[in-house]
C-alpha cells in the first residue's frame, strides 16, 4: 500500500544520511542510480526527498548506500515536496517554474556541483530556448533549454 509523509522531517533526515554515505563512499548519483531503470535526475530527486522510489529501485540504491529496511520503506513513501522555503509566486505560469525549482532545485544543485565543482550556472551569460513540440500522447509539450555558463567559486 502506498504511504504518504505528513512532514519533511523523516525524508530530510534520510537525505542527510544518504548524502553523508555518498560522500564517504565517493559515489556519484549516476553510480547510485545504475540498475534502477530510472533517470539519474529522478533518482537524485528521490534520494534528496522529492519523489518516492519504486520498491526495486529503493532496494538497488539501499544496497549501494548501506541503508536498512526502514530506509527502503521510507524511500518508497510519497514525500512532502518542496525543498526551498520562501515566498510563492501567484502567476500560474511563473508558479510552475517555482514548482519545478521546489522539486528539482536541490537535485540540479547536487548534479551541477558533482559534474562541474563548486560554482554556479550564470543567469547573465545565459541562453534560454523554448520550443513547442507535439506530444505523442496528444496535445503539445514545451521543451525549455536553460544554457548558462558555469562559473566556478574562486577562493580569495
Swiss-Prot record:
Molecular function GO labels: cyanate hydratase activity; DNA binding
Ribosomal protein listed as a keyword: no
InterPro entries reported for this sequence: Cyanase, Cyanate_lyase_C, Cyanate_lyase_C_sf, CYNS_N, Lambda_DNA-bd_dom_sf
Presence of the UniProt keyword Lyase in the record: yes
Native species: Burkholderia thailandensis (strain ATCC 700388 / DSM 13276 / CCUG 48851 / CIP 106301 / E264)
One BP annotation, GO: cyanate metabolic process
Keywords: Lyase
Role, per record: Catalyzes the reaction of cyanate with bicarbonate to produce ammonia and carbon dioxide.
SMART domains recorded: Cyanate_lyase
The protein's name: Cyanate hydratase
Amino acid at each position: 500500500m502506498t504511504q504518504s509523509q505528513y512532514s519533511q522531517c523523516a525524508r530530510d533526515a534520510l537525505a542527510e544520511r544518504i548524502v553523508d554515505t555518498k560522500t564517504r563512499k565517493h559515489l556519484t548519483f549516476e553510480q547510485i542510480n545504475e540498475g534502477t531503470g530510472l533517470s539519474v535526475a529522478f533518482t537524485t530527486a528521490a534520494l534528496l526527498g522529492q519523489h518516492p522510489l519504486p520498491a526495486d529501485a529503493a532496494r538497488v540504491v539501499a544496497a549501494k548506500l548501506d541503508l536498512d529496511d526502514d530506509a527502503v520503506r521510507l524511500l518508497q513513501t510519497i514525500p512532502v515536496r518542496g525543498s526551498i522555503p520562501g515566498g510563492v509566486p501567484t502567476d500560474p505560469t511563473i508558479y510552475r517554474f517555482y514548482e519545478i525549482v521546489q522539486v528539482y532545485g536541490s537535485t540540479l544543485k547536487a548534479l551541477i556541483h558533482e559534474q562541474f565543482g563548486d560554482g554556479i550556472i550564470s543567469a547573465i551569460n545565459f541562453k534560454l530556448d523554448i520550443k513547442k513540440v507535439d506530444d505523442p500522447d496528444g496535445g503539445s509539450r514545451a521543451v525549455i533549454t536553460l544554457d548558462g555558463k558555469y562559473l566556478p567559486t574562486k577562493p580569495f
